[in-house]
Curated annotation (Swiss-Prot):
Species assigned in the record: Anaeromyxobacter sp. (strain Fw109-5)
Main function: Antioxidant protein with alkyl hydroperoxidase activity. Required for the reduction of the AhpC active site cysteine residues and for the regeneration of the AhpC enzyme activity.
Gene name in the database record: ahpD
Protein name: Alkyl hydroperoxide reductase AhpD
NCBIfam families to which the protein is assigned, alphabetical: ahpD_dom (TIGR00778)
Enzyme nomenclature, EC number: 1.11.1.28
Family, per entry: Belongs to the AhpD family.
One of the GO biological process terms: cell redox homeostasis
GO MF terms held by the record: alkyl hydroperoxide reductase activity; disulfide oxidoreductase activity; hydroperoxide reductase activity; peroxiredoxin activity
Length: 185
């Protein structure tokens, strides 16, 4: 049984739909396997649930998708920074802030382990989880202009939504005492 399958089985009964959706979104669709698992890694990292991230990373690496996994982790880390910064600028709405340079390093965007479009796709998923409208719009535009179609973008956001739901369900199950923490081993 794969790490993600073990994790799915550990989801509480209240999250039966999440269990089924987790299986469905990680198979097929408009994304390549690398894109699918890069999005899953970025989403799991953004969702901040250690057992989930461990399982998704182990699964991606077992499939030989180390570059996608690394870019997924990089995207989540960059978006943890950028989503806070750009969400602030968007929420405040003062021109003075939007005219100031961010001065935040984002060198990984220029040198991804996969491709620029894929890293942007992973960033889009993390930004959707983090709730940064400005970042979601920007990444979606770059991704589509980079040749990734809207159906693939839709699939990526579906993965992000289900991964986030799995993180919530795992945390709720742990708090409710119904399940012990899950390991990827």
């Amino acid at each position: 049984m794969s790490p993600v399958d073990r994790l799915r089985e550990a989801l509480p009964d209240a999250a039966r739909d999440v269990r089924l959706n987790l299986q469905a979104v990680l198979q097929g669709g408009a994304l390549t396997e690398g894109q699918r698992w890069g999005v899953a890694v970025a989403s799991a990292a953004a969702a901040r649930q250690p057992a989930l991230l461990s399982a998704v990373l182990a699964e991606a690496r077992s499939r030989g998708l180390d570059s996608a996994a690394e870019d997924g982790l990089a995207a989540a880390a960059l978006m943890a920074m950028n989503n806070v910064y750009y969400r602030f600028r968007h929420m405040v709405g003062k021109p003075g802030y939007t005219e100031m340079p961010a001065r935040l390093r984002m060198g990984r965007l220029a040198q991804p382990a996969t491709s620029r479009a894929d890293l942007e796709l992973f960033s889009l998923a993390a930004s959707a989880i983090n709730g940064c409208e400005a970042c979601v719009r920007t990444h979606e535009d770059v991704v589509v202009k980079g040749g990734i179609g809207e159906e693939a973008v839709h699939d990526a956001v579906r993965i992000a939504a289900v991964i986030h739901a799995a993180a919530v369900a795992l945390e709720a199950g742990e708090v409710a005492g119904g399940h012990e923490a899950v390991s990827a081993a």
